[in-house]
Structures are given as C-alpha cells and as structure tokens.
Amino acid sequence: VYKRQLPAGERPPCDFNLISRYFYNCPAEDASHTIDAETTADLDLNAVFERIDRTTSKVGQQCLYARIRTLRGQEDAEAFGRSTDCFSRNGELAASCTESLSRLTDEDAYGLQNLIFDTPAKVRYFAWVYPLTLLAVATLLAAPFYPLSLLLFMAIFAVNLYIHYSNKLNVSLYGSAVKQLSLALRTARELAVEEVPGTEEATGQIRQVAEVERRSRVVGTQGDSANELAAIAWLFIELAKVAFNIEVILFQRFIGSITARRDAIHGMFRFIGETDAAISVARLRSETQTCRPQFVDGKYLKAEQVVHPLIDGCVPNTLVLDGTGLLLTGSNMSGKTTFIRTLVLNALTAETLDICFAGSYTAPYMRLLSSIRISDDIAEGTSYYLQDVS
C-alpha cells in the first residue's frame, strides 16, 4: 500500500527552514494553543517529526508539521483521527491517494504556500499600460493611411518593451509556484474523485482555484530553443506580447485572481496536506505500537506502558495521577527528564494526531508548556530564575 514511501531512517534529512514556513505563515486564529520555539527545542520536536513523518508530498509534510505544533481542540484531533481511520481501513484508497500525492514531491512544492501568504507583486507602470496599448493599436491601424504613424508605433513599442522587461522578473518569480499550483489542482481533483475526508468542502475551493490556474498560463511561458520553427513562432508571439502589453495585462489579472481567491487556494492546500498527513499517521500506526487517546474532564491522567518515540527499545512506564500533581526525584542520569519529555510528547501527539505511543492514554485536553533547556548567561546578566520566568 505504501510502496512509494521510504522507511524513516532512509528518508532524506528534513529542511525545517522550508517545512516550518507554512506553520509560521499560517494564522492560528482557530488554534487554542501553539507550541512555541522553546518547547519545540525542549521536546526535540523536530527530531520526533523526522521519526514519525511518513508523508509523500511536500505540502503534506508542511501540514503535518503545522498540525503537530498547533492545538485546535479535542474535536479537531478526533476528526483527524477519523480521517486516519478511513485510510487505515482502506489500503487501496491510501495507495491511490499516495500515487496522486507523489506529484508534489519536488522541493519547489514547498513554495506553493507563497501564493497564499506572500505580498502580491506589483506591476510596474501599470497606469500607462492601457493608454499605450490603445495608442499602439490605433497607430498600427492608421499606418496604411498615414505611413508616418509607424514612427510613433516604434516609439510606443520601445516604451512597451521597457515596461515588458521591467516586469519580466516578477513573472519569472511566479513560474515555479504556478507550476506547482497546476500540479496541486490536478492532485486535489483526483483526491476529490476518491471522496476522501474533506471532499465536500474542497469541491467549491477546487473550482475557484481552477479559475486562477487558467489565468496563470501566461506565467513562465518560454520558447523552445531546441526546435527552430517553435523558436521562430515564439519570437513573433513575444513581439506581439511586447507591442500590446499582453503579458503585463494578463499577469496583472493573474495577480488579482490570486488575491481574490487566496482563501480557496489555502483551502485546497490544506485539503491536500491534511489528506497526506492522515495517510502518514495511518502508516505510522501500522508500523508502530500506538493507541488512541481518551479525553476526559477533570484532573485525571493515566498513561500505561508509555514510551518515547525517539528511543529504540525504550522501557515502558506507567503513571496514574488522580487529582494530584507529581514531584519526580531521582539520581543524575536516571531518566527523569526523558520521562517528562515522554509524557509531554504523548500528550502532544494525542491532542494533534489522535495517537499515543503507549498501551493506553487517558487525560484531559490541555495546554502544553515546558521549561527544560534553560541556562544562565553572565554576559547578558540573566540567571536561571530570570530565564525561567521570562
């Protein structure tokens, strides 16, 4: 079912500068809590992510990373668990979706989220574009009757040439993102045909993104230098684009369509990413001893046979807290901090991925904070206490 996947140890190293970009850009308005950089470091969360990541696409990788650092409440975790169940029960569906998701494995796919969050490029000198285009058409039509109008046309062409190539960089910058948008649209359509979880909401978003994709075809179009006839044809097309500002006008419309439909692009992005993340967790369940968490009200925690996902051959531990706290003591190097990390990591995966690395896990849905890797700094005049409370 997952033949396209590599075992975790054989997968290429994660580039967290690219993977985390979506998490840092995405507004967390619907989140009850996000895992900050300090807690991420305390829990070795990036290393944990590398161990549990089974995603196929770069979009899925970004969404899985954002999910594991964003707590959106018990209902969201349980809904994600139901999506995971869907792929756990239906291996053929998971395999078919994995095939579709494999289109978005190129590193350029990390840049798809730029279309959602980046400030749109501004077309330079756009106020002059329509008047110059009308003048170019008028002088060309007048040429058979007033040949001298060709001189005016050449002057206008020179100005349009400057405008055209002044904006060429903006057009080229969108080239790879537009290619990934087309691939993502095709992927989303195929996932929708399979009626994976989230299809009903995504259908309208896919339709809106298709309108953006149609307007994006002007971006990144280049001539075929390997074919002389094609190169000649492309040259004449390029001259027409320059003379009548065709590329500049279409690019402006493309930017406008992206701005107007960012929510739809984001919705489609999440539809693809959440599907990939759910398949990833389904695969993780099939490979690793895990359980489904039970969320309860009140001050009660029971974790049986809980282990740390980064430690091979980890000795399981059991903890029950019923209305009480815990003071953990022991000698140096006895595993106190590792045990704390184990509990917090399992609480985190329970509240974000609806799985735990344990025999059973019962606890309330709660905020997660840590302060483990702190130190004093004489040069900056900070003590352990100040670092802890700041």
Where are these regions (language model features)?
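Alpha-helical coupling/stalk and coiled-coil linker elements that connect catalytic or binding modules
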Residues: 3-331, 339-344, 350-368
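A general alpha-helical scaffold signature found inside nucleotide-binding enzyme cores
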Residues: 179, 387-390
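Flexible beta-alpha connector loops of hexameric P-loop NTPases
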Residues: 370-388
